[in-house]
């Protein structure tokens, strides 16, 4: 069996593909797996590091502005896409995959379209509650479309071969909460707030937490991933406290989740998959400039399900917002209900189920 994964640019598009590839290797040890990406994406280093073959195809995304410069730039983007489509077709002809899997990012569009035109089996895995342009345009021609959120169904016109299988996420073995707090040298009696904004951090979240850090540490522990770009600035403005653990990046994320009673973070699809798989209650701050405002759609899915509270990015810095977060952090019964609701939204075997669907499609050739 030969499977070609097309997706990347960011971890949110790449890691679901890596999770599916890992499951395929368990189920079909002799499977041939390769990836297609771009030189500027995270896949350029991550895929070879994991031992998979990587094919590179230059492709860019459309500019969404209406300025003359954007229009002119998009002419070049379209020309690049046509060239990428030709390269994709040549790659598919050479590699002869049984299934082409698209997980988003600029490179997935030419690969999926070429595969569909060549009558190859294709599977689209959409991470967000508001599907991307590639998913919406190519869903009708796909062999199967797999969504992470049930709410995303309404954006897909062709409901045939449409499945909700969740978003493959990292798995963690959570330590006992007491042991997790000991790892961070924090108080065992206080509730713990875990804050992160992705590996690169989130400036507005960092600013809000820095502004309210005295209020937070007056009654709670704080485990805080600032991101590399903000760490030195944050560190220089903080007073030492036995109730704070701060770092640019949390290597032992499972321990951090284990210590946390409540999580404050962005509403990226991968983070939400981790939160629901672990049954963690959360306060979500959607990134306001996300394409199609997809993080707000993601957050609303959890809020509607009773698993999260939503705070707008421009309101997070207000003292009232920090007080509301702390009020929730100290409300054990509400946190318990939210945690149970979070777990109900989970798809913990998402990668396995998707791998089974890929195998099923391959057998139909």
Swiss-Prot record:
SUPFAM superfamilies: UDP-Glycosyltransferase/glycogen phosphorylase. Its EC number is 2.4.1.227. Keywords: Cell cycle, Cell division, Cell inner membrane, Cell membrane, Cell shape, Cell wall biogenesis/degradation, Glycosyltransferase, Membrane, Peptidoglycan synthesis, Transferase. UDP-N-acetyl-alpha-D-glucosamine binds at residues 10-12, 128, 170, 199, 250, 295. It is a peripheral membrane protein. The lineage of its organism: Bacteria, Pseudomonadati, Chlorobiota, Chlorobiia, Chlorobiales. One of its GO terms (molecular function) is UDP-N-acetyl-D-glucosamine:N-acetylmuramoyl-L-alanyl-D-glutamyl-meso-2,6-diaminopimelyl-D-alanyl-D-alanine-diphosphoundecaprenol 4-beta-N-acetylglucosaminlytransferase activity. Gene3D superfamilies: Glycogen Phosphorylase B. Cell wall formation. Catalyzes the transfer of a GlcNAc subunit on undecaprenyl-pyrophosphoryl-MurNAc-pentapeptide (lipid intermediate I) to form undecaprenyl-pyrophosphoryl-MurNAc-(pentapeptide)GlcNAc (lipid intermediate II). It is found in: Cell inner membrane. GO terms for biological process: carbohydrate metabolic process; cell division; cell wall organization; lipid glycosylation; peptidoglycan biosynthetic process; regulation of cell shape. It catalyses: di-trans,octa-cis-undecaprenyl diphospho-N-acetyl-alpha-D-muramoyl-L-alanyl-D-glutamyl-meso-2,6-diaminopimeloyl-D-alanyl-D-alanine + UDP-N-acetyl-alpha-D-glucosamine = di-trans,octa-cis-undecaprenyl diphospho-[N-acetyl-alpha-D-glucosaminyl-(1->4)]-N-acetyl-alpha-D-muramoyl-L-alanyl-D-glutamyl-meso-2,6-diaminopimeloyl-D-alanyl-D-alanine + UDP + H(+). The keyword Membrane applies. Belongs to the glycosyltransferase 28 family. MurG subfamily. This is UDP-N-acetylglucosamine--N-acetylmuramyl-(pentapeptide) pyrophosphoryl-undecaprenol N-acetylglucosamine transferase. One of its GO terms (cellular component) is plasma membrane. Pathway: Cell wall biogenesis; peptidoglycan biosynthesis.
